Amino acid sequence: MGPSLFADMAATINATLQSETANSYVTLAEANTYFETVPSSTQWDNKTDDAKNRALISATRWIDTLNFYGDRCDADQALSWPRNNYHVDRVELACSAIPNDIKYATYELANALANDTDSITGTTGDTGLYESVKLGEMEVKYNTSSQATGTVNNVFDVYPWLQSYLGAYCLGGSGSYQVRMVRG
C-alpha cells in the first residue's frame, strides 16, 4: 500500500467568527502570542506550526462537545461560539467576539493535547478501567478484549482545571454515554 494522500497535508486554521467552515476559536498567531506570556511556553514553542494547528483544532473540537448557555449567533455556524442571549459577570455575550475565557481554555487545552495526544481518548489496547461493577443483581462489564480506542465522557474528567475557564458558560457537561448492563 502506498503513502497516504493526506500524509503531507498541513492542518489549516479557520477562526472566522460565525463561519460555516470554522475549525478553531483562535489563530496560531493568537496562540503564539498567548504563550509568550506564560511560564510553560517551551512546551508550546518546541512544537511545529502544523502540530500546533492540529492541537488548536482538536482543542476546539473537545470544547465544542460541552453544552453552553445562550444561543449560537448564526444557525449555520460550525462552532458553538460566538453565542448571545446570556450574561457572564453582568456582561452580555456578543456575536462580535469570543470571550477571552473560551480562548484561554483553547490555548491551554491545545498545549496539553500537543504534549499528550492520547490524554482524552486513551490509547488503543485491550484493558479497561474495570472488569465489572456490581450492585446487587445489577452488574456492568466493560469489554476488555476490544482493540478500540478508549473514550472519556467529558473533557473536564481529564482536565478539571478547564472548569475555571469554562464553568460560567457551561450547562454542566458534554452529555451522556451508553453502557451495556447485564443481569447476573
Regions found by a protein language model. Name each.
Residues 2-184:
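Divalent metal-cofactor coordination and adjacent catalytic microenvironments
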